[in-house]
A protein has these predicted regions:
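N-terminal loops that bind phosphate or other acidic moieties
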Residues: 1-162
Length: 162
């Protein structure tokens, strides 16, 4: 079970990691304009959330941690990558409304909602961008959350000659 504190600390940790790798992410920035600022803009955007999350009490809910993150990121968004990041968290936050804690299924749904909102908000979504990274991450999370396929058939396949 994911508590508000766990989500809060995870987002803070992610913000710190992005800040530490800002220059590397800047180097990856080649589309739509190779201006080398994606890491900087994303770092500033999630950095705004980090600042507010540090002031959030440890007994916060996942709803509150997600809402504070989404709101701070929207207000602190810098550049296209910052705006898209804030949209991802906006959808993520909406999916966690009313939740004190979250399980894996809740987080998968939140990721999916974030991706859906970000794709809808971009006029011409282009694959090979941060949208793709978010979508694939969401799909992989869903795959890990799905029940494993059964090793036994409940009915014999028509191709089986047993």
């Amino acid at each position: 079970m994911i508590t508000g504190l766990t989500l809060k600390n995870s987002i803070i940790s992610g913000a710190n990691n992005l800040s530490n790798r800002r220059a590397k992410v800047d180097e990856l920035n080649v589309f739509p304009v190779p201006d080398g600022d994606t890491g900087t803009n994303m770092g500033m955007t999630i950095g705004a959330a980090r600042t507010e999350l540090l002031n959030l009490p440890d007994d916060c809910t996942v709803e509150k941690a997600a809402q504070v993150t989404a709101s701070a990121m929207l207000r602190g968004a810098r550049g296209n990558s910052g705006v898209i990041s804030s949209l991802l968290f906006r959808g993520f936050s909406k999916a966690l409304q009313g939740k004190k804690t979250a399980d894996a299924k809740d987080l998968v749904q939140a990721l999916e909602k974030g991706v859906e909102g970000a794709y809808k908000a971009v006029m011409k979504p282009t694959e090979g961008t941060m949208l793709t990274v978010a979508r694939v991450a969401s799909e992989e999370a869903a795959a890990w959350c799905a029940p494993p396929p059964s090793a036994r058939w409940t009915t014999r396949p028509s191709s089986c000659r047993c």
